[in-house]
Amino acid sequence: MPINFLSHLPYELAIQIVLAIADLRTISKLNLVSTRWLLVSRDDQVWKPLYLTHWRHATPPRTLQTLQRAQRDWISLYANRLLLERNWREGNVAARFINGHADSVYCLQFDGERILSGSRDNTVRCWDYASQTCVRTFEGHEGSVLCLQYDERYMITGSSDTTIIVWDFASARKIATLREHALAVLDIRFNADIKRIVSCSKDCTIKIWDLDSLKCLFTLNGHQAAVNAIHLHGTTIVSASGDCSIKLWDIRTGSLIRVLAGHTRGLACVQFDGKTVVSGSNDKTIRVWDATTGECVRVLEGHEALVRTLCFDERRIVSGSYDLTIKVWDRVTGELMVDLKDAHASWVFSVALDGGKIISASQDRKIVIWDFTVGVKHLQDLIY
C-alpha cells in the first residue's frame, strides 16, 4: 500500500517542498494526489511568493483594504494576472473612443481614474475614465496645448503661444502665466517634492523654475536644435533634441551630467525611470540606454516613420508613431508583442500606460482607450 509521506511532514515543510517544485503544471496536478496535497497546493503561502516571483517588480496594492483582500486569495490573483499577461501577448484588446476636442490632441496624462488631454483647439479637457465624459475644461492658452502635467493640486501646461500656465487643478483657475521662452513650449515636467518645474522649447533651451515663487532660476543652453522632450526623475533631467542628442542634467546646479549619442536623426520623445532612458527618434528607432554608463543596450526597430511618443513600465515599452501604429515591446527582450495597426486615422502624438490599459491621442482628434483587461476579474486587487 502506498505511503503518503506528506501526511507525516510538518505543514510548513510541505509548503517549502511545493515552492521548490516551482513548476506550475506540476503544482496544479497536486490536488489530484490527496486531500493533504490539495490543501498545500492551494495555500496562499504557495501562491503569494509565486506571484511576487513571477511579477517581482510589482508595487504594493494601493490601499490596506486591497492588501487584505489580496492576501486572502493569491491563487485567484495569480490566475487573473496570468490572463492579463496572456491578453498582452496575444493582443486581446477592446478599444473605446473619446471624442470632444475640436482639433488634434497633442498630449495626455492618465491616472487610472481621469484622462487629461491637451489640444490644438487651445483647451485642456479632463475626462472621467469610467464614463468617458468631459467633467472639466481648462481655457486660457492662445495656441495649441502641446504638453501638460498635473497632480491633485496643480496642473501645468505649455503651449505654442510660448507661455506656461500654472492652474489650480480642482477649480480650473489660472494661477499664473510664465513668459520666458521665445518660441513654443514643447514639454513640461514638475516635481512638487523638490519644488521645481522644468520646461523645454523650440527656442533650444531648457528652463528651471521654482514651483513656489514661479520665478525662472536658470536656463540650460546646450542643445543646438529644438528641445522636443524632457523627463524629470528625482533631481535628474533628461532632454531630447532635434540635434540627435540626449542630455542628462542635474536640476540643482544645471550642470551637464552625460550625453547619450546614437540616434541618426532628431529625437521626438524620451522617458526616464532613474536607471533607464528610452528614446524615440525620426530615424524610426527606439533606443534603450543605461543612464549610469551612457551605453545603448538595445535598439528597437519596426516603426516605419518618426517615433513621436513612448512610455514604459517594468515589463513593457509602448510607442506611437507617424506610421499610424502603436507598438508594445517586451522591455526585457526587446521583442515586439503587440502591433496596433491603423490605431488612428492620422499621426499618433501621445501614449500613456497604466496597468492593463494604453491611452492614445492623435492628430485625428480622437483619444482611444486600449483595454487589455478583457475577461480579467478582481482587477482592483492586481498588483502592477
Say what each PLM segment does.
Residues 1-7, 19, 24-125, 371-384:
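Intrinsically disordered, low-complexity acidic/Ser/Thr/Pro-rich linker and tail segments
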Residues 108, 124-128, 148, 164-168, ...:
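WD40-repeat beta-propellers
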